[in-house]
């Protein structure tokens, strides 16, 4: 089971296309679009891999209440939940459309963020990639490699 935590419908559809291409249309995938649903899922199950956005809303949009504002550290909340459950060895690919990730109130370039999450949070199998909608080749390549591993 692959858990995809992504609130952008276009980006999640592109990720799902890659999952189907690499693993096949029968791949077991759970797609959630907010921190609360990701944490609930992780409370009940442990996926084999996670593809994680960093800027996520705290909860699902409720009828008549508007869309929740994405939190720049929403993905970190998911990582903290994984750490609480001692799942620091779970394969994780951070896929974010921002060039930097705010970690402990400090902006860290995406390319350096995986090392920071290893050193500061104890994750052992974490990668990070910049999602560039203008140049899809690098992030698609990285995502396919992650899915194949």
UniProtKB/Swiss-Prot annotation:
Consists solely of a response regulatory domain. Residues 1-134 form the Response regulatory domain. Keywords: Antiviral defense, Phosphoprotein, Two-component regulatory system. Possible phosphate scavenger member of the two-component regulatory system Detocs that confers resistance to bacteriophage. When the system (DtcA-DtcB-DtcC) is expressed in a susceptible E.coli (strain MG1655) it confers resistance to bacteriophages T2, T4, T5, T6 and SECphi27. Detocs inhibits T5 infection leading to growth arrest but not complete cell lysis, during SECphi27 infection leads to cell lysis. Overexpression of this protein along with the intact Detocs locus cancels T5 immunity; when the phosphate-receiving Asp-53 is mutated to Ala in this protein, immunity is restored. The modification 4-aspartylphosphate is found at residue 53. InterPro entries: CheY-like_superfamily. Probably phosphorylated by DtcA. This is Detocs response regulatory protein DtcB. One of its GO terms (biological process) is defense response to virus. The keyword Phosphoprotein applies. It comes from Vibrio alginolyticus. It comes from the Bacteria.
